[in-house]
Amino acid sequence: MGGLTALELAGYWQYAILGRRQLWIYSDSRRARSILERLSMTADPSLRSRKLFGGPELGVETRPLDLVTTTLGPATSSGSDAPTHNQMLRVSSLERAILEVLDEVPRTVGFEHAAQLFEGLTTLRPKLTSSLLESCRSVKAKRLFLYFAGQHSYAWVRAIKRTEIDLGSGKRQIVAGGRLDPEYNITVPAEGRPAQPRAAR
């Protein structure tokens, strides 16, 4: 599980998309697609590629899902025993999940929705976040991440070394009719706050 599903299971239900839920499942296996098509589920499984990152296992954790409360427990080793009412899941960490979400802006996730999700990410792990940004293959996702990070004064933001992140070249249209953010060369809502420039590290 990853993306928006991982964030919801981690407690970000208040930002869930209304209507029938999608399960963001990351796999490049043809067999996985065949199995999912045969399942009868109360949510729509949506299969996505794991090729967004150079390290397919980077930031993926084994965590217990409480089947009663539908909440995730802390990350654990894959061989750990879980209570009988728990199901062990391979799920994206918050750091990986938010980049998976940003890669789908504005295709399946709106800019404002992504901004709301980012507001709650107060405790990201700087080392893992930096590694994921360096491994991420989506220039758009990385630029959006750094743009949103510039809106907040979270402690982990100061540890991100922008000079080690490949942000590509050229402009990216994210919001049609928006203004161009000069720091990251992406279009953002005209009424939004400008990103606060930071000295390169």
Positions of predicted regions on the chain:
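Leucine-rich, amphipathic alpha-helical/linker segments
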Residues: 2-7
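Phosphate-handling catalytic interfaces
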Residues: 8-201
